[in-house]
Curated annotation (Swiss-Prot):
Any single Gene Ontology cellular-component annotation: cytoplasm
Gene: rnc
Natural source organism: Oceanobacillus iheyensis (strain DSM 14371 / CIP 107618 / JCM 11309 / KCTC 3954 / HTE831)
Name recorded for this polypeptide: Ribonuclease 3
Cofactor: Mg(2+)
Subcellular location: Cytoplasm
PROSITE patterns for this protein: DS_RBD, RNASE_3_1, RNASE_3_2
Binding site for Mg(2+): E45, D118, E121
The keyword Nuclease is assigned to this record: yes
Region annotated Disordered, chain positions: 205-228
EC number from the UniProt entry: 3.1.26.3
NCBIfam families: RNaseIII
Keyword Nuclease tagged: yes
Residue ranges annotated for the DRBM domain, each copy included: 158-227
Amino acid sequence: MDIRPLEEHLGISFQQKALLKEAFTHSSYVNEHRKQRLSDNERLEFLGDAVLELAVSQYLYRNNKDMPEGEMTKLRAAIVCEPSLKNFAEELEFGKFLRLGKGEQQTGGRERPAILADAFEAFLGALYLDQGFDNVLDFLNIHVFPKLTTGAFSHAMDYKSQLQEFVQQHKDQKIEYRIIEEKGPSHNKEFVAEVVIQEKAAGIGTGRTKKEAEQRAAKNALDSINNS
C-alpha cells in the first residue's frame, strides 16, 4: 500500500508509516492475507476511541464554561457516536483508502457506517501515537470542532423540548416562539427569535436558521430559569 496519496490527501506526513497503513486495514483484508502477518485497525480503533473522547471532553469543558455536566455528556455522546464518526470519515473520503477483503469490498464495505467510524477512530489512534495529543487536537480543530458552531449536533441539545417539559409542569402556561428580527442579505441571514411564556418574554436567541434561533432562545430561557 502506497500511503503517499493518503498523506497528501490529509495534509499530514507520518513518521511511522506502518501506523497509518494499519489504521486503514480492515480485519477482512488481514484474513485474506495471512501470510503477510498484517495487523488490522482494531487495536488502533480502541486507542482512538479513548483519545477522541478525551479531546472532545476537553474542548467542551474549555469552550462551554456555563454548560452543565449533563449537557456536556449529551453533546459529547452525539459527537462520538457511530453516525457522526461515519460522517467525518465520509467527508475526509476515508472509504477509498481502506484495505478491505474482496468479500467486504464487494458488499459495500467502503460505505459501511461501522467500518468508516472505526477507521476514523483508528486514524486518530495512529495520529496520537505518531505525533501526540496536540496534533490530534489540531486535526479535530479543523475537521470536527467547527461543526459545533454550525448546529450539526443541535439534535443532542434540544432546548425547546427541555423548555416544553418545564412549561408542562405548570399546566396553564402557554409557550410561543416568535421571529422578531431578520438581519443580513438573503444568502447570509441571521434570525433573532424570542420565546414567550404566558405572554411574557422569557428568552432570546440568534441563529443562521429560524430553528437555530429558536433553540438558542429556549436555552436562554432555561438559563434564566435555572439561575433564578
